[in-house]
Design a protein with these regions (language model features):
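Conserved acidic, metal-coordinating active-site core of Asp-based
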Residues: 150-215, 408, 412-415, 419-530, ...
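Structural recognition of alpha->loop->beta junctions
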Residues: 228-241, 282-305, 366-382, 443-444
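An N-terminally biased module of ancient metal coordination in phosphate/nucleic-acid-related enzymes
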Residues: 1-96, 181-182, 194-202, 206-277, ...
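Extended substrate/RNA-proximal surfaces in nucleic-acid metabolism proteins
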Residues: 2, 65-70, 74-230, 290-291, ...
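Mg2+-dependent phosphoryl-transfer enzymes with acidic/Ser/Thr/Gly-rich catalytic loops
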Residues: 305-313, 330, 502-559
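Substrate-recognition/cap helix-loop segment adjacent to the acidic, metal-dependent catalytic center
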Residues: 223-236, 354-374, 475-493
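Active-site phosphate-binding/coordination module
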Residues: 84, 88-121, 331-436
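Non-catalytic pre-domain segments flanking phosphatase-related domains
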Residues: 1-8, 304-316, 335
């Protein structure tokens, strides 16, 4: 067993930026470019918080996933940039423009998108009037021209200012706000806005974390800011921007005191807009900003209902670890598990190389049903949330990989199977199938032409293939492995989980990466993760956890 005392999760040394804008509102870098910049800056995560818009989130997430797929395993699991769905809602409070940042809301909900679209249309109507008013006085501008210069963006006053600067009508962007379109300027037209209370309630309705942005930018004074926080806290405000690009050390300290006073989550960000805010950098603001990852971890724990930063999470293999020789759980083990979860408020994850449908059946048969319980199947390729009854993470082998694996298995005289839903799928069932299904109670679909048309036989790309040889695994499996690795170099994870089983998994699918992902997802420091296992496929999990426990009955590599 390894002690967690000296364990350090590198994620917690990295900064985050939870307030960032792209070209989908008034920033000058695309969502894809922001992902690259965040990686170059060494950020663990950033929140895309465009004004009244969710249009850039999918692009940023796709860019982040694509970057991870082309990184090494270690880079993908430890330093891949996480993109957080965010938004910045403009509201009106006592004649002032107050901004509410929302994180982790359900941006795919049609009702959410419809409401945000209405916010956007109100902004469009206001901007059209402002541009028309300027044009009437001879200023060379039209809303259509600004829109053409910012394709796909939600147009803000910053876009209008940038257009006037780029067309050489004004000498600086600041001039536009001080003389033309600032709140007290002749061409400013206010727009109908929702109240900050309604913005907070709106975000909470869709599962979001509402945060008061840059609290000292509104110049409310101490009493005024206190009153605003009281009103917003009453309707569900969850956070306040403690770290901000313009905050002095004293203001940061003051904001942290307010967070503690009102039991709010501290957040922080640069409010990066690219060249629209000269000198302001992503992640570091004007040079002194550092938003610690621990703040994001706290926000994640709040979202998932995790009590605090001391909560522990136990990842446990079943076969040869949690389970007895009769594939059950002993009374003493069950009592210890109950105490760990119910008595101390910790979390449990049943982690197995088995197919997810079988892991679910196993948990049901064993009557394992704890609050905040998760299942990890296919050696970590799939994660399942038991409370929400849904899969939220899945990595797969391509149909091309599956087709090649089946063809090579036939060439080498090896039995191979894959999985589709709750079924084992193979071309020809035999003694290996019978051996496997002694304990894994899944239906078998045979005579399936997986090696010819996997895209027809299978309903979706699978998480895993399994080669079984009961006679001469040391002689027959290595040549097969060599051929498969030559066909897909560095694209699969091939591992002998026992003397007879060769696991064929997606390249990043290991129990260790699953542990890392789930801890990151929940906001739990890996020093608080415990893992127990007995086989080679458990080793990455034991190495990734703060405390790794190798079973005495296990193979030497699991010690």
């Amino acid at each position: 067993m390894r002690d967690a005392a000296a364990f350090s999760d590198p994620l917690y040394t990295m900064p985050v930026d939870l307030h960032v804008h792209s070209t989908r509102s008034d920033g000058t870098f695309t969502p894809t470019q922001l992902v690259s910049m965040a990686k170059e800056k060494g950020l663990a995560a950033f929140a895309l918080t465009d004004h009244d818009s969710v249009n850039g989130i999918e692009e940023a997430m796709d860019a982040s996933i694509d970057a991870a797929k082309h990184a090494s395993i270690d880079a993908a699991r430890n330093t891949g940039v996480e993109v957080i769905p965010g938004i910045e809602l403009s509201t009106e409070y006592e004649g002032k423009d107050v901004h509410i940042v929302g994180l982790y809301y359900d941006y795919e909900d049609p009702d959410f998108q419809s409401a945000v679209n209405e916010f956007t249309q109100e902004r469009v109507r206001r901007n059209q009037k402002m541009c028309a008013k300027m044009a009437a006085d001879g200023i060379p501008i039209s809303y259509e021209a600004v829109e053409a210069a910012n394709p796909g963006a939600v147009i803000t006053r910053a876009n209008i200012a940038r257009y006037l600067y780029d067309t050489h009508y004004i000498s600086s962007i600041d001039y536009a706000f001080s003389h033309l379109i600032g709140d007290t300027c002749p061409y400013f037209i206010p727009r109908e806005k929702i109240s900050p209370e309604k913005a907070v309630s709106f975000l909470r309705r869709f599962g979001g974390i509402p945060i008061l942005a840059h609290p000292f930018e509104y110049h409310l004074g101490d009493e005024g800011l206190d009153l605003l926080l009281q009103r917003l806290k009453a309707v569900g405000l969850m956070g306040i921007e403690v770290y901000y690009c313009k905050h002095s050390p004293e203001e940061t300290e003051k904001a942290m005191a307010l967070a503690k006073k009102y039991d709010l989550l501290p957040s922080g960000g640069s409010d990066f807009h690219g060249t629209n805010k000269p000198g302001l950098e992503l992640g570091t603001g004007y040079g002194h900003l550092f938003v610690p990852y621990s703040l994001l971890a706290g926000i994640k724990r709040a979202k998932h209902g995790i009590p605090d930063e001391t909560t522990k999470i136990f990842f446990c293999d079943f076969d040869g670890t949690l389970g007895t020789s009769k594939k059950d759980i002993s009374p003493a083990t069950r009592e210890a598990l109950d105490s760990f979860v119910y008595g101390r408020g910790n979390l449990f994850v049943l982690s197995s190389g088995r197919a997810m449908s079988d892991v679910k059946s196993l948990a049901e048969r064993l009557r394992l049903s704890y609050p905040h319980m998760f299942l990890s199947g296919y050696n970590g390729a799939e994660l399942y949330d038991c409370d929400r009854e849904e899969t939220f993470f899945r990595e797969t082998l391509s149909f091309k990989m599956v087709k090649t694996a089946f063809a090579l298995a036939k060439k080498h005289g090896l039995y191979i199977q894959t999985y589709d839903g709750d079924a084992i799928v193979t071309e020809e069932a035999g003694k290996e199938t019978a051996y496997y299904t002694r304990y894994v109670k899944m239906p078998v679909r045979e005579n399936a032409l997986v090696g010819e048309h996997p895209e027809v036989v299978l309903s979706e790309e699978p998480c895993k293939c399994l080669v079984i040889d009961l006679e001469d695994p040391r002689g027959k499996i290595p040549p097969f492995v060599n051929d498969l690795e030559a066909a897909f170099p560095g694209q699969m994870n091939l591992l002998m989980s026992n003397a007879n089983y060769l696991e064929i998994d997606p390249i990043h699918a290991t129990k260790g990466n699953s542990l890392i992902y789930l801890c990151r997802y929940l906001g739990i420091d890996r020093k608080n993760a415990i893992a127990a296992g007995d086989a080679p496929n458990d080793v990455p999990m034991l190495e990734a956890a703060g405390v790794g426990i190798g079973m005495l009955n296990g193979l030497g590599t699991a010690d």
